[in-house]
Amino acid sequence: LNGKFVKNFIDMFGDTPMAQAEALRYHGTTLLDAAAGKLPAVVLRGGAYLRHGMMGADVLANLVSAAHAKELYVILDMDTAEPECWAGYGADAVTVCPYGGSGCLEAGEMLPIAAVRTGGQGQSLMAGDRALWLSVAEQMARRGAALAVSTGYSLDVRDVRRVCPGAFLLLEDCDGENALPAFDDMGHGALATDSALQYAAEPATAVEEAVRAWKQWVTVV
């Protein structure tokens, strides 16, 4: 969060974990208000809250509940190998790390979203004649997982859609033009995230502009 923004809470609570947690609570609530009725889902990055201990965990739980009250689908971004540990937060889906085996898919009632392609250097590794991440994506999709793919290139999106034609895709920071191959003719099959929205000076306006831009590429029927 912006230092000036956090300072307002430090002035109220002192330089304490409570100040950091309350800043996150206010920031998150503002973003949920902006998203309500305009976006289908929100992604809450668990680490940003849990780094502030029990108070941060409390804020995370409150934001999950608040998002559900606004009829938003909640994805808890943990990139975890043990998703059942986070079931108590009540999120609808959780990101999991698939490279430790299929045990990461034991997510209880949450949808496991396997983070098969990240921004790390390991994405260039090969498995036979194709990228390792595509091989992992295929295995995860066969077991019913959705797939998180971090890319800005339509070729990557085409590749994963070809290998996993029925998998639901979570595309991280991919613009509408490059994300287009992920969607079917009805505009279904994928969800795109836009991390820039959380830093917007006017979140409500930024959300409206983002929705307008996406509708140029994808129309949900």
Feature map (PLM): residue ranges:
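Short, well-ordered coil/turn segments that N-cap beta-strands
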Residues: G37-A41, K70-L72, G90-D92, M110-P112, ...
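Conserved N-terminal beta1-alpha1 strand-loop-helix module at the mouth
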Residues: L1-N62, A66-A69, E208-K215, T219
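C-terminal helical cap(s) of enzyme catalytic domains, especially alpha/beta-barrels
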Residues: P181-V221
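Conserved anion-binding
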Residues: G3-V6, I10-D11, D15, E82-A148
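Short, acidic/polar
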Residues: Q20-A35, E82-W86, W133-L134, N178-L180
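Active-site-adjacent beta->alpha loops and helix N-cap segments on the catalytic face
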Residues: R51-A66, P83, P98-M110, Y153-C164, ...
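A C-terminal functional module that forms or caps the active site or interfaces directly
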Residues: R25, L147, G152-L197
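Catalytic beta/alpha-barrel core
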Residues: V43-H52, Y73-D79, D92-G103, A115-R117, ...
